Amino acid sequence: MRGVCPRRVRDGTEPAVISRYPEAVTGSVPRPLLFLDVDGPLIPFGAAPRRYPVYGVASAPGAGGNPLLARIDPEHGVRLRMLPCDLVWATSWMADANECIAPRLGLPQLPVVTWPGAPDTGQHDERDGLHWKTRALVGWAAGRSFAWVDDEITRTDRAWVSAHHPGPALLHRVDPGTGLTSADYLTLGRWLRTAGGLPHPRTAPGLVNGPASCG
């Protein structure tokens, strides 16, 4: 699905990967993390014959970019920044998410989860029905409260996180046919405020709870 990122560095170097939020951002009481997938939540797919809206162009002509990038609604960036959390890319796009996705959403360079190359563990998890991201995300969070937004989350993942993660966690599955919706943002906003010990201000219908900036 990914194709080629038109902003990918072509000289053999890799874009910088931010591995963690610095202490100055997290402070003594860190906000919840939000691990964000791209394909499904931000780039809807698989709902043929539905025609998806197109927002701008995927890439310059001849750049070999992924045409599905044009499905990314820039409004997601506004809504994500309103959530009281620290955003982290948790996607197979890895560093390309900062190069290709973040600019379309008006987001800064975000930390990126890098997936460990442990084929034996991955094969074992797959046999047990555990998603290949789950173990790495729990390790990355290191006990910190987190929400994980993905289109492939199952009961097995929720049970594993409940047994292995000491802090609050929300594993929120998004319908890949629609991507993130207002209802999803409402659920995320409420949970993140509760996990972060914040009040729940009244908001107009369709708006995300909270003025705090994510990222």
Task: Please tell me what each predicted stretch does.
Residues 100-215:
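C-terminal cap/substrate-recognition subdomain and adjoining C-terminal extension
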Residues 10, 87, 172:
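A broad, low-specificity signal marking well-ordered, structured residues that form hydrophobic/aromatic
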Residues 19-20, 26-123, 193, 214-215:
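Alpha-helical substrate-recognition element adjacent to the catalytic core
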Residues 7, 23, 37, 54-57, ...:
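Intrinsically disordered, low-complexity regions enriched in small/polar residues
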Residues 5, 44, 60-62, 66, ...:
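Serine/threonine-rich low-complexity intrinsically disordered regions
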Residues 25-26, 79-80, 139-140, 164:
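A general structural signal for short secondary-structure junctions and capping/turn motifs
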Residues 2-36, 46, 197-215:
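Non-catalytic pre-domain segments flanking phosphatase-related domains
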